[in-house]
Amino acid sequence: MTSQPHLHQHAAEIQEFGTVTQLPIALSHDARQYSCQRLNRVLADTQFLYALYKKCHWGMRGPTAYQLHLLFDKHAQEQLELVDALAERVQTLGGVAVGDPRHAARITGVPRPPDGIEDVHSMLSRLLDAHETILADVRDAATRVAGLGD
């Protein structure tokens, strides 16, 4: 036995994304599967919204730059708190939370912004549209998973 750390280890996945383990939580496998699927979509959207807030935060220009810079940073932090709560809920249901930003970018419903800097009005509009997209999906998901008992 050695006290040296075991570096550069890579093991096989112990649970694939999109699967749920059986847990004694009085909720059917199908209900947990569907809930995890919908929650992962919301999680990906929220991760993407966090990144969008930071992009706007860093790219702020003009006379309201300072105030919006602070506001966007506050909202970005709130998104991070939601990301953690959503991911933990997926795990609680026996699922695997989407944790890789590349994976989140593939499953998000929030449109990708341009790579450059937009004007302030476009940034605000893009953020509002992203929130509306997420809210519509969350409302639909909540209704459907409630119908399954979750």
Curated annotation (Swiss-Prot):
UniProt xrefs under Pfam families: Ferritin
Gene3D superfamilies: 1.20.1260.10
Molecular function per GO: ferric iron binding; oxidoreductase activity, acting on metal ions
UniProt cross-references to InterPro entries, sorted A to Z: DPS_DNA-bd, DPS_DNA-bd_CS, Ferritin-like, Ferritin-like_SF, Ferritin_DPS_dom
Sorted UniProt keywords: Plasmid
UniProt record similarity statement: Belongs to the Dps family.
PANTHER family named in the record: GENERAL STRESS PROTEIN 20U (PTHR42932:SF1)
Protein name, UniProt field: Uncharacterized protein in bpoA2 5'region
Natural source organism: Kitasatospora aureofaciens
